[in-house]
Structure formats: structure tokens, C-alpha cells
Amino acid sequence: SPPGNWQKADVTFDSNTAFESLVVSPDKKTVENVGVSQVAPDNPERFDGSPCVLGSPGFRSGKHFFEVKYGTQREWAVGLAGKSVKRKGYLRLVPEERIWQKGLWWLG
């Protein structure tokens, strides 16, 4: 655990917001990109242009950390999004779009 007053974020993912190729586990603690579209109702909360899913709780302040297990995936990202983040259409993963993220991409 990190030094100081950092708190581990106990994240629960919201399957109603999940992009079509993201599958949220039944316990809502993990997300997997299966690479193919899943049947999911279109709703205003769902991301339809970028592989994103929202989780809770939200934070307004403090120091929080996440534990990420990415297995054998060559590409992954984890981050924070503002509650009012755009859900429809392509989303650039940059602070100007209310997204702050870290990840690994293979550029080869």
C-alpha cells in the first residue's frame, strides 16, 4: 500500500455504460475487452464510440489508487473521467474531454 494517506479505490463498474466490446463481470469488479460487439441496449449512459466504461464511487478530492491486472493483454488503459464526460461518438482520451488515463499501447 502506498505511503501517506492514500486510499485504495474499491471500484464497481457500471455495465449500463460499457462500450459494446467490453464485458463487465457479474460481480462488477472486472472488465474485459472481448473484441467483438455484444448485444446491449442503446441508452444515453452507454459509450458508443470509444471503449470505455464508468465505475463508482466518484471522487471530489483525496488521494486514491487502483490495482490493475492486465494479464497477457498488449494494450490496456485505466483512468478517471468526469461525470459529464461525452458518451456518444469518438472520445479523445485527454483532459480536455474530461478523461485522465494511463495505459500501455503497442506501436509496432
UniProtKB/Swiss-Prot annotation:
Compartments where located: Secreted
Key words, A-Z: Neurotoxin, Secreted, Toxin
One MF annotation (Gene Ontology) recorded for this entry: toxin activity
UniProt keyword annotation of Secreted present: yes
Tissue specificity of this protein: Expressed by the venom gland.
Record-linked Pfam families: PRY (PF13765)
Family: Belongs to the ohanin/vespryn family.
UniProt name for this protein: Thaicobrin
